[in-house]
């Protein structure tokens, strides 16, 4: 798939921007702070309905404006879908598909697939478990949009359950072991059921990612260093060896029972997919805390490339967004990454310095300065 047009109104530093894009490689060059990342962020937003840089939408709207609009034409298998997103911080965002006003946000999720590589990816390896959970969940949702619903159902259950636990903690109910809290039993069951669905999907995804990430890491670094992805579930100390949902429901139910006194004391949910982690191992050591800067960065790239391979195997190349990644790599790794990604249907690259972009990625070139984007001829 590829994006053939992008139009922005009041998005970040852009009052108005319009670009025509082609399949193949396009490079966006310009000095720091001119709006290169804002462009790829906007395309990523169309795919995931979130930004890789901020957790909330407010910074996406141009200072002084009320709302931002992103319009993107996405060409898939010869058909064009016109997606329009209106970002209204503090209020519901709105979507239109092919100009139809009767579109829900979730109707346009999963039309455009992107894989974004950015300096922030280092947090995949070095950051909190939430970064890795988000990586898995975004990939799940790209492959099967219904997981957006599963994730938001899970978030809702968690919020309700936490509110209940918080008020129980305030009333010191843990002294009675929570026996007279039938509503908590109901929320436990919801959490176990929906949590198991998410857990099963994540475990299956990790199993698929493992060989692809190992291959990508080997190719990027030209080493045989073994990497392994291990899903750590908060419900058990052992490594889970099943993706069977009824079994996972049982495991979560039992863990919730065990955790209840602690949860009532602390007033938060301590068990479930929101507390899990994807541990990344390199050479039989956890990458977090042991891997070098260069190894961590290659690991993060390998995870993104594995995601790319999975989406590609599902039948359509995602659009690759490479935001300022070459500056972080030595010449050899730049070349290796470039030859890996240049086979994708569309690759959009940003760089402050043209020389950072390997020759393998020559293509259309755009100059970005002060909120305007011009194609170089
Ligand atoms: N909501 C906003 N309203 C107005 N301007 C904004 C908004 N958000 C970001 N900006 C501006 O956008 C610019 C940053 O754009 P961007 O991150 O795309 O830069 P870049 O060209 O990728 O730079 P670098 O090469 O340093 O990564 C900054 O000048 C910032 O002040």
Curated annotation (Swiss-Prot):
Q: Where found, per UniProt?
A: Cytoplasm
A biological-process GO annotation: DNA synthesis involved in DNA repair
Q: Which residues bind ATP?
A: 30-37
Give the SUPFAM superfamilies listed for this entry.
P-loop containing nucleoside triphosphate hydrolases
Q: Name one GO cellular component term.
A: cytoplasm
* Alphabetical list of Pfam families matching this protein: SMC_N
- Which Gene3D superfamilies does the UniProt entry name for this protein? P-loop containing nucleotide triphosphate hydrolases, RecF/RecN/SMC, N-terminal domain
> Which InterPro entries does its entry note?
DNA-binding_RecF, DNA-binding_RecF_CS, P-loop_NTPase, RecF/RecN/SMC_N, RecF_2
From the UniProt annotation, give the residues forming the signal peptide: none
Keywords per UniProt = ATP-binding, Cytoplasm, DNA damage, DNA repair, DNA replication, DNA-binding, Nucleotide-binding, SOS response
User: NCBIfam families this protein is in?
Assistant: recf
The family annotation for this protein states: Belongs to the RecF family.
* Job description of the protein: The RecF protein is involved in DNA metabolism; it is required for DNA replication and normal SOS inducibility. RecF binds preferentially to single-stranded, linear DNA. It also seems to bind ATP.
Name of this chain's protein: DNA replication and repair protein RecF
Q: Which organism is it from?
A: Thermobifida fusca (strain YX)
Instruction: Tell me the lineage of the source organism.
Output: Bacteria, Bacillati, Actinomycetota, Actinomycetes, Streptosporangiales
What gene codes for this chain? Answer: recF
């Amino acid at each position: 798939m590829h994006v053939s047009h992008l139009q922005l109104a009041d998005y970040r530093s852009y009052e108005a921007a319009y670009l025509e894009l082609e399949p193949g490689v396009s490079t966006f060059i310009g000095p720091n702070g001119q709006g290169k990342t804002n462009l790829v962020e906007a395309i990523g937003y169309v795919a995931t309905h979130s930004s890789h840089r901020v957790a909330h939408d407010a910074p996406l709207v141009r200072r002084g404006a009320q709302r931002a609009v992103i319009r993107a034409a996405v060409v898939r298998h010869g058909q064009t879908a016109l997606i329009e997103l209106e970002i209204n911080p503090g209020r519901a965002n709105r979507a239109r598909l092919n100009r139809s006003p009767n579109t829900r946000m979730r109707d346009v999720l999963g039309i455009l697939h992107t894989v974004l590589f950015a300096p922030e990816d280092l947090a995949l390896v070095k950051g909190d478990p939430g970064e890795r959970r988000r990586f898995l969940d975004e990939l799940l949702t790209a492959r099967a949009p219904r997981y957006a619903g599963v994730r938001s159902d899970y978030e809702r259950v968690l919020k309700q359950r936490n509110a209940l636990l918080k008020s129980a903690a305030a009333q010191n109910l843990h002294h009675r072991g929570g026996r007279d809290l039938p509503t908590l039993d109901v929320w436990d069951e919801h959490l176990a059921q929906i949590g198991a669905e998410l857990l099963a999907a994540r475990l299956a995804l990790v199993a698929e990612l493992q060989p692809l990430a190992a291959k990508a890491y080997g190719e990027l670094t030209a080493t045989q260093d073994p990497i392994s992805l291990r899903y750590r579930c908060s419900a058990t100390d052992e490594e889970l060896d099943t993706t069977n949902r009824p079994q996972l429901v049982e495991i979560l139910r039992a863990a919730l029972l065990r955790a209840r006194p602690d949860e009532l004391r602390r007033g938060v949910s301590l068990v479930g997919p929101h507390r899990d982690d994807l541990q990344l191992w390199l050479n039989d050591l956890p990458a977090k805390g042991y891997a070098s800067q260069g190894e961590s960065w290659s690991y993060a790239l390998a995870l993104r490339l594995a995601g790319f391979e999975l989406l590609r195997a599902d039948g359509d190349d995602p659009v690759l967004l490479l935001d300022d990644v070459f500056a972080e790599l030595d010449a050899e790794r730049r070349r290796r990454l470039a030859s890996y990604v240049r086979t994708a249907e569309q690759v959009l690259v940003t760089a402050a310095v043209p020389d950072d972009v390997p020759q393998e990625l020559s293509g259309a070139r755009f100059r970005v300065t002060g909120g305007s984007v011009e194609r170089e001829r």
